[in-house]
Regions:
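Alpha-helical scaffold domains
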Residues: 1-153
């Protein structure tokens, strides 16, 4: 897709009809990664990350790919690895969440720091004690990440 609108249309189909669009298949990660690397803006990356999350939730093997993405030179790929488990609630893999955040906790980029806080705040709705302990154990988290993580606790 050459235009943002086409990508948004594709992502809308993926989200509305995941079983028909094969959204949660491991093979779909290649398309999502292409969107991340070529979309290069937060709104498209965040929407794509929800689709990535479908794969992560259905295929435990995708966690290894997210750990690799967490250290990728491309900031948007790293952001996706951090936020791909949003809204997974009790199906969130805290080990994966911890690993992708730890790989990025000292990054000074706003979009990474915000993603860390967002991912932690979202998981706090499910396991606030885990998030409090994580934030306390990671003094290297930026003030923005800490504030966002603890906002509703």
């Amino acid at each position: 897709a050459a235009h943002r609108e086409e990508r948004y249309a594709a992502l809308a189909i993926i989200r509305s009809k995941p079983s028909v669009s094969h959204a949660g298949r491991m093979e779909s990660l290649a398309l999502y990664e292409h969107f991340l690397r070529t979309g290069q803006w937060w709104d498209l990356v965040d929407e794509t990350s929800h689709a990535v999350g479908l794969v992560v939730r259905e295929h435990p093997a995708a966690a290894a790919r997210m750990r690799a993405w967490a250290t990728d030179p491309d900031m948007w790929v790293r952001r996706s690895a951090i936020i791909c488990q949003l809204q997974h609630k009790d199906r969130t893999d805290p080990g994966l969440l911890s690993d992708v955040i730890e790989a990025n906790q000292e990054d000074s980029e706003f979009f990474i720091r915000k993603a860390i806080g967002w991912a932690l705040r979202d998981y706090a709705r499910t396991d606030g004690d885990w998030v409090r302990a994580f934030v306390q154990a990671h003094p290297g988290l930026s003030p923005l990440s800490r504030r966002e993580a603890l906002k509703r606790l």
